C-alpha cells in the first residue's frame, strides 16, 4: 500500500496539480496581501541576472502606465506598442498634479524598498555596441566634408530682399573678377576716347587744307582716309 501511495504522489497528473495549486496560492498572495504584493513586484522588476544586473526602480510614469497600457492594449488589439506609448505619454501630460500625486507616492515607496534591498546601487546604463566603420569613405561623407570646408566662414550680402551666402574663396574670386572688369572698362574707355580724339584731329587737318578740299571732284563732298 505504501508503494501505491508513493506512485500516486509522484505521478505526472499529481505533480501538475500541485504546481498549479502552488502558483495559484502565490498569485493570490500577490493580489490580496499588500506586503506580499510589494515583494512580488520587487521580485519581478529587480531580479538579478547572471551578470548581476539590477533594474532601476519604477518612476511615477511607469507606475501609472503599467495598468493603463494593459487597458489600452485590450481596448485596441490592433494598435502597435509604439503607438500605445505615444498615447500614454500624451495622456500623462494631460493629467493634473492632483491626479499624478498617488503615482509619485507609490514611486517613492518603491524607491525606498529598492534602496533597502540594494544600498550601494548606482545606475549604470548599458553601452551601445559600436558599429564597424567602413574602410572606404562613402560619397555622402566626401560631399559633407567639402561642404563643411566651403562654408567654414561664410559671409552674407543683402541685395534688396535676396540673401546670398559666399565662402571666403568665392568672395576673393568675385572681388578679383570685379577688379579685372573695372580695369577692362577703363582701358576700353580710354581707347575709345583716344580713337575719337584722333578722328577729330584728322578732320580738322582735312578742313584746314581748304585748297586741297576745293580741288576735289564736284561729285565728292569729302575724302575718305583709312585709319
Curated annotation (Swiss-Prot):
Keywords: Activator, Calmodulin-binding, Cytoplasm, Differentiation, DNA-binding, Nucleus, Repressor, Sexual differentiation, Transcription, Transcription regulation. This is Sex-determining region Y protein. One of its GO terms (cellular component) is cytoplasm. PANTHER family: SEX-DETERMINING REGION Y PROTEIN (PTHR10270:SF161), SOX TRANSCRIPTION FACTOR (PTHR10270). GO terms for biological process: cell differentiation; male sex determination; sex differentiation. The keyword Acyltransferase does not apply. Pfam families: HMG_box. Belongs to the SRY family. Its main location: nucleus. It comes from Moschus berezovskii. InterPro entries: HMG_box_dom, HMG_box_dom_sf, SRY, SRY-related_HMG-box_TF-like. It is found in: Nucleus speckle; Cytoplasm; Nucleus. PROSITE patterns: HMG_BOX_2. Interacts with CALM, EP300, HDAC3, KPNB1, ZNF208 isoform KRAB-O, PARP1, SLC9A3R2 and WT1. The interaction with EP300 modulates its DNA-binding activity. The interaction with KPNB1 is sensitive to dissociation by Ran in the GTP-bound form. Interaction with PARP1 impaired its DNA-binding activity. Coiled coil: none annotated.
Amino acid at each position: 500500500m505504501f508503494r501505491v501511495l508513493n506512485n500516486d504522489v509522484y505521478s505526472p497528473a499529481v505533480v501538475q496539480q500541485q504546481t498549479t495549486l502552488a502558483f495559484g496560492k502565490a498569485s493570490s498572495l500577490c493580489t490580496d496581501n499588500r506586503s506580499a504584493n510589494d515583494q512580488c513586484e520587487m521580485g519581478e522588476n529587480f531580479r538579478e541576472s547572471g551578470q548581476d544586473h539590477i533594474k532601476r526602480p519604477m518612476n511615477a510614469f511607469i507606475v501609472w502606465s503599467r495598468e493603463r497600457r494593459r487597458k489600452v492594449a485590450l481596448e485596441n488589439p490592433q494598435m502597435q506598442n509604439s503607438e500605445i506609448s505615444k498615447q500614454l505619454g500624451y495622456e500623462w501630460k494631460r493629467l493634473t498634479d492632483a491626479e499624478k500625486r498617488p503615482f509619485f507616492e507609490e514611486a517613492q515607496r518603491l524607491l525606498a524598498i529598492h534602496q533597502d534591498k540594494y544600498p550601494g546601487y548606482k545606475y549604470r546604463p548599458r553601452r551601445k555596441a559600436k558599429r564597424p566603420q567602413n574602410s572606404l569613405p562613402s560619397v555622402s561623407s566626401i560631399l559633407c566634408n567639402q561642404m563643411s570646408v566651403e562654408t567654414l566662414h561664410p559671409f552674407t550680402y543683402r541685395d534688396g530682399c535676396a540673401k546670398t551666402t559666399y565662402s571666403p574663396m568665392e568672395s576673393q574670386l568675385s572681388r578679383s573678377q570685379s577688379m579685372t572688369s573695372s580695369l577692362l572698362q577703363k582701358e576700353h574707355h580710354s581707347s575709345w576716347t583716344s580713337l575719337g580724339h584722333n578722328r577729330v584731329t584728322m578732320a580738322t587737318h582735312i578742313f584746314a587744307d581748304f585748297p586741297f578740299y576745293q580741288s576735289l571732284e564736284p561729285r565728292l563732298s569729302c575724302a575718305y582716309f583709312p585709319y
